[in-house]
Amino acid sequence: MMMSSRSSVSLGVLLLLAVILSAGAADPDILTDFVVPSDTDPSGIDGAFFTYKNLVTGNSGDPAKLTVTKATHAEFPALLGQSVSYAALVFGAGTVNPPHIHPRASELLVVVQGPLLVGLVDAARNGTVYTQTLQTGDMFVFPKGMVHFQFNNGTDVVARAFSAFGSATPGTISLPAALFGSGIDDTILDKSMHTDQATVDQLKQDQAPPSPRPSPGSSSSAAAALLPSRWAITLLLCFAASYYFYF
């Protein structure tokens, strides 16, 4: 009976842990309708605070390259706490958005000028790759944290798309840059990729180290600090519960 009771309580603790972790994975909740940056006078807030005009005008880069213009909290402070952000993408002919992940958000992409080849990797199904050639008006969802890519395989046509994210700071981790531009020891890369030093050197050649992101304002830092706090509290609860019910 004691073991059954402990098992039931342990199951309850695990379920509670799952709920806490699920809540911590999203953007931190805010207690107001919107967040005013610490360097902004609330009495001066007007419609301009909720307006962002650079998504399209800032997206007229080199048509032979991939150009990504973001509207995240870093560019559009009014998004803090709103769990949403946006990006405009212009794919020159033959350009690719390399395999990458967004650790904090799902992505919903809509093509406004196609075609555009997209794909994602399902690690839970032995690395199955799902691809689709999208035409103008088509949409595609990339679940949070899954490796995905976009490729304009046309020879003379520019492709354009917009992406919505379920976080004000979705984050982007480019796999080529993370592996070959981050300073990981060459021996580790050699052994991990089952290749040789010459191949690793060649792969590193075009991967410059990622630029550090600017430090966010104090309001952003305070909100972002909620997430680590939740993890710390969760771990403490877990250890405490395990100790209590074991002994």
Swiss-Prot record:
GO terms for cellular component: apoplast. Gene3D superfamilies: Jelly Rolls. Residues 53-201 form the Cupin type-1 domain. InterPro entries: Cupin_1, Germin, RmlC-like_jellyroll, RmlC_Cupin_sf. Mn(2+) binds at residues 100, 102, 107, 148. Its main location: secreted. Residues 1-25 form the signal peptide. Glycans are attached at residues 126, 153. Keywords: Apoplast, Glycoprotein, Manganese, Metal-binding, Secreted, Signal. SMART domains: Cupin_1. It is found in: Secreted, Extracellular space, Apoplast. GO terms for molecular function: manganese ion binding. SUPFAM superfamilies: RmlC-like cupins. May play a role in plant defense. Probably has no oxalate oxidase activity even if the active site is conserved. Belongs to the germin family. Oligomer (believed to be a pentamer but probably hexamer). This is Germin-like protein 9-1.
